[in-house]
Structures are given as structure tokens and as C-alpha cells.
Amino acid sequence: MSSYGRLDEHEQAKLEASRKTKKRIAIIAISSIVLVCIVVGAVVGTTARDNSKKPPTENNGEPISVSVKALCDVTLHKEKCFETLGSAPNASRSSPEELFKYAVKVTITELSKVLDGFSNGEHMDNATSAAMGACVELIGLAVDQLNETMTSSLKNFDDLRTWLSSVGTYQETCMDALVEANKPSLTTFGENHLKNSTEMTSNALAIITWLGKIADTVKFRRRRLLETGNAKVVVADLPMMEGRRLLESGDLKKKATIVVAKDGSGKYRTIGEALAEVEEKNEKPTIIYVKKGVYLENVRVEKTKWNVVMVGDGQSKTIVSAGLNFIDGTPTFETATFAVFGKGFMARDMGFINTAGPAKHQAVALMVSADLSVFYKCTMDAFQDTMYAHAQRQFYRDCVILGTVDFIFGNAAVVFQKCEILPRRPMKGQQNTITAQGRKDPNQNTGISIHNCTIKPLDNLTDIQTFLGRPWKDFSTTVIMKSFMDKFINPKGWLPWTGDTAPDTIFYAEYLNSGPGASTKNRVKWQGLKTSLTKKEANKFTVKPFIDGNNWLPATKVPFNSDF
């Protein structure tokens, strides 16, 4: 039976604290609503002043709502945005969240049509068939990612931006594969098929980026502590993070539930067989111990294989080796010796080699398109396109990366920390370029961050021109900071992709690097190259803000520096 007496001092204090907390949350929520109204009003007011044409209308002839106008104004493809959101049911009465979800929904529908178009080809030659096959896989990845986006909370702004950035990357990679086939008609086919879905994806990304900035302004972003004593941090994918805590103690080899050994002393002799046993979409880690040996196989960690932890006997002892390459007819995206798509993947003490050699051009050793992935004390060994950091959030610590042309490339949000980056001797007539970052859209939260690494030659490269990188796409983003550069780096530092300059829209930066190759005195004079960042600007590319690492790396027990 309840007692209805006077509260003691302790209970009274708890009640008062609870009231203050609720009041604080209410103030924040009201502030958020007020700010959204102010910003929407400002945007719409600006649009009205700048637009002398008749206002766009919904399908039923009614004027487009204030929310639709505000959201479409921040997009890169406004006409497509008005067309898309204007067709939303009850668009004039829909909230920004509902309109965003609708934008994602119609993008899924459009990409499903695109997938059908790539799946129905007949009588194709080998190059066309290979490129179309790559597109089928990539568009499938995009659809899956958008479906996950549909079920996520709108407050998960970092996650949503990452996932929508990856959806754009998947479509761009499909286009790259079609261009690689070197058939103008195939390129035109791809451009026509992908135009609508690419614009829709870009618009959804722009909308969530803008909404995230509003939330940031009022400190209402997820994972932030409320100023209360009993507040908890909300982290990305909490069940997965909790599961990873199984890694916190003990020898991972002894914890392994699956053992692979060339000599037959394990359950399996190949890594592929071991992965087939892994439970799909498991929130807890599946630890696979791969004993020393050279495993001659192309390995794929599929998108449904979550939280796989693979441990070897050493980066020069447990080696995965294969030789797929572009010259022999495989699209770059599918040449990887080891390819990872399942989120939460971790590898340590392993080596990944593509043996194709420099004459075979693009030949990837490791390709990663898995969110929240980690590589610790691993070696990636090839020539052109060694390390394909394709998409999502990734972290590499104490790794060794060898290569020649564009050998760290892709469009992930990726941090390389305390790694050795070793350019090697290329083919005759070639020059070395370490990075080729593939950011295509200004709203993508992607880029390559090289932090506290060592850049030195593997071979004698005194007669070889070696550059820090070249901009693969229009918004290419690469930052090298607090790293050692040996004297073999060309004083110009960076190389254009084509012509004699780079797009003004790139973001390249060097910050507090050391060594005889680190001087920025004679660097190229590009508008997009920054050689005098402030500490605050450079810090944006460290683990904590750039890949949200403080929320998911601690559970892996891999050492990392969250900032400077």
C-alpha cells in the first residue's frame, strides 16, 4: 500500500532535480522549434524575394508549402526537389522529417527502376557484362542503405549523412565502372539511367545536412550530454557497440569460435568457408582466428555478415593473396583480394596482397565499404589502387600501405593513424601519387585524413616523381597532418588529375608536418590547397569529429588518438 506522507529531504531533492531536467529539455525543444521556424522563414523570404517567376505548385495545383520551399532551397537540384516533394501526400501539411522520409522513399523507388535496367541486359560482351554486373551490386547496396535510412531516427544526423554519402558513392562507382569499359554508348546509358536517382540522393543528403546544422546550433544533436548528473550518451548502433565489449579482455585468438588453418589444424582451410558459417546480422562479434600461412583466395565479407573480427598471427605471417586486375577484364571495384561490406568489421595482424603487378594497372589489395570498420597492424601490398577506402566510416592504426599510383583512394570518411605509407617503384614512365579522394558532392561528409603517419620510400625513388595525391573528383578532400614526409616528395606536393590545375572546390590541406619533404614553400598555388590551417580547422579531421570515433572505437580496444 502506498504511503502519502511528507517527502524526506533526499526525495525532495530528487524531485526538484527531475523538474529542472524536464524544464531544461522543454526549453531546448522549444528553442529548436523556434529556430527552425526562424530559419525556414528566412529561407522562404529570401526565395520569395529572389524568385520573380510564378511559385511552384503541388500536383493538385495548390502552392508549394513553406517547408517544401525551405528544404528545396538548400538542395543542388531544386527543380527535381520541387518535383519530388511537391508530389508528397499532404505536402503542405508535412513536417520536415516527413518530407525527408518521403524524399528517401521515392529515391528507393527510382533506384529500384535503375536496378531493373542494369539487370536486363542481353548479348553483352565481357567488358560490358562486367561493368553492368558491378552496377547491379552497387545499386543493390544503395537500395539496402536507403532502406536502413528509412528506419532510422531523424536525430541520427551523423549516421544519416554517412549513409546518404555512401548511397551517392555507390552510384558514382557504378558510373566509374561503366566509364572504365571504354564504350561511349555504355557511358551514355549509365548517365541517363542514373540521372534522376543521383539528383534525388544529392537532394536528400542536402536536406539532412541542413537539418543537422540546425540541430547543432541549439545543441540538440544526438550523442550530446544534457547538463544533468544522470544523463547518458546515446551512441551509434548501441546493440553493436555493447556486443563489441566482448573484445575488451583476453587473447582474441583464444576467444575465437572459428579457426582457419592451411595445415588442417583448424575447422576450415579457407577464409571463405569460415565466413559462410558466420551468423547473419549478428549484433555480437564473431571472432575468426586465421593461422599463419598464405591463403590464395579472393575473400568477401558480405553485407549481412556483421561484426566479424578476424585475427591473424602477424601482418607478414597471415597473408591473403590474389591477383584480379583491370587489364585482364575485371572492373576496379571487383579486383580486391579482400573486400568488406559487413558493418563492424575488424582485422588485426594480417596482410592483404594483390600480386597482379604494375603492368596490370588497377589491382586492389583491400577494399572496404563497411561502416564502423577497423584495421590494426595490417599490411596492404600492391601497386596501383592498393587501398580502396570505398565508403562509410573507417579507421586504420599501425598499418603499412605500399603502392604506386593513387594507392590510397575512395570516398570513405577514413582516418589513417600512425601508419607507414610506402611509395614504391612504378612502371617505366609512371609517377607516384599517394592519394586520390573521390568526394563528388559538397554535402558528403567524406575525405582522407592522414594523421601522425610516416611517408617514406620503399625503394630508391630519387628518379621518380612522387606526389601526395591528385583530386579524383570535384570536391576531393584530403588532409595530411602531423606526419613525417621524407625528401623524395616532389616540392609541388600535389598533381592535377587533368590539365595544369585542380577544381577550386577541392579541400586539400597540410598541417604541422615534419621532415625534408614537408616544406610547403614551393607547393602548387591552388585555391583549394590550404597550407596554413588553424588548429581548430585541422582538428575537424581527427578521429572524434571526423568519424565519430569516440563513440565506437573504444569497444574495439584498438589504440587511437581522438584529437591532437
Swiss-Prot record:
Source organism per UniProt: Arabidopsis thaliana
Residues with glycosylation annotation: 90, 126, 147, 196, 452, 460
Top-level division of the source organism's lineage: Eukaryota
Topology term for the membrane: Single-pass membrane protein
Pathway where this protein functions: Glycan metabolism; pectin degradation; 2-dehydro-3-deoxy-D-gluconate from pectin: step 1/5
Residues marked Transition state stabilizer (site): 384
Reactions catalysed: [(1->4)-alpha-D-galacturonosyl methyl ester](n) + n H2O = [(1->4)-alpha-D-galacturonosyl](n) + n methanol + n H(+)
Note, other: The PMEI region may act as an autoinhibitory domain and prevent untimely PME activity during transport.
Membrane-spanning residues: 25-45
Entry GO terms, CC: membrane
Subcellular localization: Membrane
Principal place of residence: membrane
Chain spans, region Pectinesterase inhibitor 46: 62-207
GO molecular function, one term: pectinesterase activity
Record family assignment: In the N-terminal section; belongs to the PMEI family.
Function: Acts in the modification of cell walls via demethylesterification of cell wall pectin.
Disulfide cysteine pairs (residue numbers): 399-419
Name of encoding gene: PME46
Classification via PANTHER family: PECTINESTERASE
Full protein name: Probable pectinesterase/pectinesterase inhibitor 46
